[in-house]
Amino acid sequence: MSRLRIFADTNPATPEFDSRDGDAIAAQLQKIGVTFERWHASAPVEPGATPEQVMDAYRADIDRISAERGFKTVDVVSIAPDNPKREEMRAKFLDEHFHKEDEVRFFVAGSGLFTLHVDAKVYEIECVKDDLIAVPDGTLHWFDMGPEPHFVAIRFFTEPDGWVGHFTGTEIAKQFPRYAPEKPHKAS
């Protein structure tokens, strides 16, 4: 289940806000310019589906958000717990960074933790199946896929080479807990 916790950036122990309600999550994130939506497939997505089958199941939403935000390319990324490069992949974006284009992800299956650092607050968003998150360009954040990553996500890009992390060099991400899903997520 999706979850948003908001902390003061100086107090990683006690959240000021904690909710699993999708509407409450969307309302809180909207205040900082982040979009949070729930999507539903127009057809079942079976385990082992090709990227084309995944995108076809969400075509109406993909086309809508691409038109609204000017995305030029869309792809599907799939990470499994047995991936031999999982530790390297996890470590890639664990430190605070930003991108020069929006980071938009839709979770077809599995989960991951986006953590945003905005105005002396830390927004910890657990995204799960059917969640779309759109993080505006320039927003400081980090992403944790967990020690045994399992997710399938649709990614949106305005420029194929524009999605590069620019790291801040701060240690704030290390002050907050790493992602450990409450229970394993099964492919959907």
Swiss-Prot record:
It is an enzyme of class 1 (oxidoreductase). It catalyses: 1,2-dihydroxy-5-(methylsulfanyl)pent-1-en-3-one + O2 = 3-(methylsulfanyl)propanoate + CO + formate + 2 H(+); 1,2-dihydroxy-5-(methylsulfanyl)pent-1-en-3-one + O2 = 4-methylsulfanyl-2-oxobutanoate + formate + 2 H(+). Transmembrane segments: none annotated. One of its GO terms (biological process) is L-methionine salvage from methylthioadenosine. GO terms for molecular function: acireductone dioxygenase (Ni2+-requiring) activity; acireductone dioxygenase [iron(II)-requiring] activity; iron ion binding; nickel cation binding. Pathway: Amino-acid biosynthesis; L-methionine biosynthesis via salvage pathway; L-methionine from S-methyl-5-thio-alpha-D-ribose 1-phosphate: step 5/6. The record marks D102 as: May play a role in transmitting local conformational changes. It comes from the Bacteria. CDD domains: cupin_ARD. The record marks R105 as: Important to generate the dianion. Its EC number is 1.13.11.54, 1.13.11.53. Binds 1 Fe(2+) cation per monomer. Belongs to the acireductone dioxygenase (ARD) family. Monomer. Catalyzes 2 different reactions between oxygen and the acireductone 1,2-dihydroxy-3-keto-5-methylthiopentene (DHK-MTPene) depending upon the metal bound in the active site. Fe-containing acireductone dioxygenase (Fe-ARD) produces formate and 2-keto-4-methylthiobutyrate (KMTB), the alpha-ketoacid precursor of methionine in the methionine recycle pathway. Ni-containing acireductone dioxygenase (Ni-ARD) produces methylthiopropionate, carbon monoxide and formate, and does not lie on the methionine recycle pathway. This is Acireductone dioxygenase. The lineage of its organism: Bacteria, Pseudomonadati, Pseudomonadota, Gammaproteobacteria, Lysobacterales.
